[in-house]
């Protein structure tokens, strides 16, 4: 890589920001691109992979027997919470600070990743580049990747016919997972595997499948939305738009603010390390050498669960139930009464608490900042703001919640609702489009690093009881 003296001030500032952010060597910054290969994501990966392959070999050889912690009965019975057991390169979740994408926090991503003009929200294509390479991309690299995604976005006709075979009333996630399965006939990995590709090259068709899948998902998702809620009148892609803006356009929303929201939404929902249901499912299924289409379809079925991806639709429905019962001008005292009513009925306040986080989710904070900028007078946003003040003290008083603070789901539905995307039942599909970027990025590295079939040991309650007796 050749570095020129005439680098732009922006590149200097970005480089300096990375150096000063006290990060690990995970994130790299290249100031100037000098050849066509620098704009090609696959070429960049091809250069990076050998180094990381040597790194994992060294880690296994020198530290393979190092213990990472003790496994307790609580962990086994409690959904493996707190159990370190997965390698996930693309992101790491800190209980206090929240998610870091390749070492960068969300505020750092907003500052460093190339953004759309004039709004400034990071382009999702930039985060895809970051997750795959560990490098903050230039605007030229992001533009090249955006063009590549557009070139792969055409969806085969049979996919639409497969979706149309389902009742239009089928849940959007059912239709979405079905559409992804129909896309699977394109799989380059399956074809290469059947031809006997060497395992050291598994990552290459995995990359091709992953990029194509990411490119086509917004088209499939938008088709489902228009089929269900807009009389089947689909909207074609616009080759002048970036990934997030094009998705908003195909859904039928062309305002600059909605395009900005979609860029933000897709970016912050991409990845949340590897232990959540959808990410873990995708990784698990892919460990059997199932291709990215099969693996991501499985991940979507996990995402569709009420305890995972459906939470964002439940938040908006709950907020609307507050308005329905208490009126639009609900006071904080009324809110307190309604929250206690919810809790005393054995339910939870949706959008609050998190399995890992012990502070306010930074994904909530950046959505709140977006709302303060674009829709400060929206009644539902004002209600969400009041909930932010009222709910945590009540949950703290209750004493049973480790994290009383809002998570990402507490805010997203209100933003979407403001711009007219009011169909809460559909919201998890948006989540799925975004999450593909993180899951598929890691799948490429799973194959590049030669990660094995996942096969943890299971035990019975009798085994646990006997083991505990011996240990006492």
Curated annotation (Swiss-Prot):
GO CC annotation terms, alphabetical: mitochondrial matrix
Organism: Daucus carota (Wild carrot)
Claim: Cytoplasm is one of the keywords in the record: no
Organism placement in taxonomy: Eukaryota, Viridiplantae, Streptophyta, Embryophyta, Tracheophyta
Protein name per Swiss-Prot or TrEMBL: Citrate synthase, mitochondrial
Complexes and interactors: Homodimer.
Family: Belongs to the citrate synthase family.
Enzyme active site: 308, 354, 409
Note: Citrate synthase is found in nearly all cells capable of oxidative metabolism.
Involved pathway(s): Carbohydrate metabolism; tricarboxylic acid cycle; isocitrate from oxaloacetate: step 1/2
Gene of this entry: CS
Principal subcellular localization: mitochondrion
Swiss-Prot/TrEMBL keywords: Mitochondrion, Transferase, Transit peptide, Tricarboxylic acid cycle
């Amino acid at each position: 890589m050749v570095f020129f003296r005439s680098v732009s001030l922006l590149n200097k500032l970005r480089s300096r920001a990375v150096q000063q952010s006290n990060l690990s060597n995970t994130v790299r910054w290249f100031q100037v691109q000098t050849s066509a290969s620098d704009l090609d994501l696959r070429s960049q990966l091809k250069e990076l992979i050998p180094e990381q392959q040597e790194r994992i070999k060294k880690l296994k050889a020198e530290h393979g027997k190092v213990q990472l912690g003790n496994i307790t009965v609580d962990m086994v019975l409690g959904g493996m919470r707190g159990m370190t057991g997965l390698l996930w390169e693309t992101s790491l979740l800190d209980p206090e600070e929240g998610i870091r994408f390749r070492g960068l926090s969300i505020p750092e991503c907003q500052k460093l990743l190339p953004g759309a003009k004039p709004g400034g929200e990071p382009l999702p294509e930039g985060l895809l580049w970051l997750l795959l390479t560990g490098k903050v991309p230039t605007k030229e690299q992001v533009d090249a990747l955006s063009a590549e995604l557009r070139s792969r976005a055409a969806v085969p006709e049979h996919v639409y016919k497969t979706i149309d075979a389902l009742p239009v009333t089928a849940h959007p996630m059912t239709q979405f997972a079905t559409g992804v399965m129909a896309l699977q006939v394109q799989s380059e990995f399956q074809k290469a595997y059947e031809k006997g590709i060497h395992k050291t090259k598994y990552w290459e068709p995995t990359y091709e499948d992953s990029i194509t899948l990411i490119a086509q998902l917004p088209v499939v998702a938008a088709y489902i939305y228009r089929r269900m809620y807009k009389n089947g009148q689909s909207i074609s892609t616009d080759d002048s738009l970036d990934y997030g803006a094009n998705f908003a356009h195909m859904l039928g929303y062309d305002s600059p603010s909605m395009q900005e929201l979609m860029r933000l939404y897709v970016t912050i929902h991409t990845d949340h390390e590897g232990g959540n249901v959808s990410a873990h499912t995708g990784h698990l299924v892919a460990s059997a050498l199932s291709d990215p289409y099969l693996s991501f379809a499985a991940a979507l079925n996990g995402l569709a669960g009420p305890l995972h991806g459906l939470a964002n639709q439940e938040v908006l429905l709950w907020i609307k139930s507050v308005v329905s019962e208490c009126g639009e001008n609900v006071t904080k005292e009324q809110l307190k009464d309604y929250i206690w009513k919810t809790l005393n009925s054995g339910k939870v306040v949706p959008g609050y608490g998190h399995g890992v986080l012990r502070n306010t989710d930074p994904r909530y904070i950046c959505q709140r900042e977006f709302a303060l900028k674009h829709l400060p007078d929206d009644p539902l946003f004002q209600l969400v703001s009041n909930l932010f003040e009222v709910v945590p003290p009540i949950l703290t008083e209750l004493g049973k919640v480790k994290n009383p603070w809002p998570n990402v789901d507490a805010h997203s539905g209100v933003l979407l609702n403001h711009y007219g995307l009011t169909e809460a039942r559909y919201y998890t599909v948006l989540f799925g489009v975004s999450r593909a970027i993180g899951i598929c990025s890691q799948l490429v590295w799973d194959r590049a690093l030669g990660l094995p079939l996942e096969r943890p040991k299971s035990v019975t309650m009798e085994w646990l009881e006997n083991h505990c007796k011996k240990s006492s």
